[in-house]
Amino acid sequence: MLELVSVSHIYANGVRALDDVSLSIPRGMYGLLGPNGAGKSTLMRTIATLQTPTEGSIKFGNIDILQHPEELRRKLGYLPQDFGVYPRVSAYQMLDHLAVLKGIASSTERKSVVEGLLGQTNLWAHRNKALAGFSGGMRQRFGIAQALIGNPELIIVDEPTAGLDPEERNRFLNLLAGIGDNVVVILSTHIVDDVADLCPRMAVLANGRVQLEGKPSDLIASTRGKVWKKTIDHSELDDHQAKFEVISTRLFAGKTIIHVLSDSQPAGFEPVEGGLEDVYFSTLSTLRRAA
């Protein structure tokens, strides 16, 4: 269990990136959903001991990670949003080098670990290829391979599917699902479907605060009977936004489909089965209206 209590982080320029964040994250896949600039990457870096919060405490099991960050690092696998590699080095060589840095001194043990990870991430056929020649999806799979060195108990992946094509995204999410049963895996993303497809529990982070937390199914149930849709001309959008709590819009065949949140059915609207996307957008809409 990962426990965060009243974690805040204020940068030197006065920006409060995290504001009183408290979370209990159990074993399994946990989704952290939020827009760009919500504070997700700051929170991931803080949990990964790359920066110290201004206030609050973080514990992983019996480890106080603020007091003993080196203990957490021995149990941590981290795939940041952006990571660099030596472009002319092969995947095999790079994983072997990283395994040495992780403390695996035995060449026989490293060989077993590296070959196993290359197979697990479906990169064995590309083991001798220079990393510079990897596609975006292959780079992300390499990233999770390096994060799995040393059998970590806590794995953090930050925006892992951004920029991947649908096939690579599905392959990567299937890989995550396969490792998420016995360890804590935090999936930080702005892509709703990533969380909906994988995570038994989730939180919505926006403006540096936890706005919503729970099981996706429970959060979806909270909007049941409250989400309505209507197809309008784009020229009518401003008028509808003034009259209703519009939580999402999308273009389809030259028309605009809007979803609104209302306790009763507005005239001209039809009911729609709400999903996690409606929960997410309604949360952000409420914040915008309160600003």
Language-model features: locations:
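ABC transporter nucleotide-binding domain
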Residues: 171-259
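Conserved structural motif at the start of ABC-family nucleotide-binding domains
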Residues: 2, 17-18, 73
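Conserved ABC transporter NBD signature motif
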Residues: 56-67, 71-72
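Walker A (P-loop) phosphate-binding loop of ABC-type ATPase nucleotide-binding domains
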Residues: 35-39
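Catalytic Walker B motif of ABC-type/P-loop ATPase nucleotide-binding domains
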Residues: 155-159, 164
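Helix-to-loop junction immediately C-terminal to a conserved catalytic motif
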Residues: 48
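Conserved ABC ATPase "signature" region
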Residues: 96, 100-103, 108-126
